[in-house]
Amino acid sequence: MPTVEYLNYEVVDDNGWDMYDDDVFGEASDMDLDDEDYGSLEVNEGEYILEAAEAQGYDWPFSCRAGACANCAAIVLEGDIDMDMQQILSDEEVEDKNVRLTCIGSPDADEVKIVYNAKHLDYLQNRVI
């Protein structure tokens, strides 16, 4: 069963961290963060990451649940996420910036690391509902 280690973008931003720093997850693990802000999820085969987070009782951001907005956007830092058809992200955002939508995304590796709540990034702001 794939495991997704996650970190809330708001925590990264509030602490002035660089989410692309190799040790950003180490820094998060050294803090006393709520489970919703940092931790790991096991995601069942065919389950979307957002669904797995909700099954744990987490209130991660979303709106459309159909890949038509950027509310549930996450940045993949390790591993990969396979998305169903999405209509909102550019090829550059998917291929170069590693943006994925957790509402239609499932892990495509045994271990994945993401920064969720990435809707706050400047280049995604105009697609948040």
From Swiss-Prot:
Binds 1 [2Fe-2S] cluster. Keywords: 2Fe-2S, Electron transport, Iron, Iron-sulfur, Metal-binding, Transport. GO terms for molecular function: 2 iron, 2 sulfur cluster binding; metal ion binding. Pfam families: Fer2. Its cofactor is [2Fe-2S] cluster. [2Fe-2S] cluster binds at residues 64, 69, 72, 103. Residues 29-120 form the 2Fe-2S ferredoxin-type domain. Gene3D superfamilies: 3.10.20.30. Belongs to the 2Fe2S plant-type ferredoxin family. Ferredoxins are iron-sulfur proteins that transfer electrons in a wide variety of metabolic reactions. This is Ferredoxin-1. It comes from Haloarcula marismortui (strain ATCC 43049 / DSM 3752 / JCM 8966 / VKM B-1809) (Halobacterium marismortui).
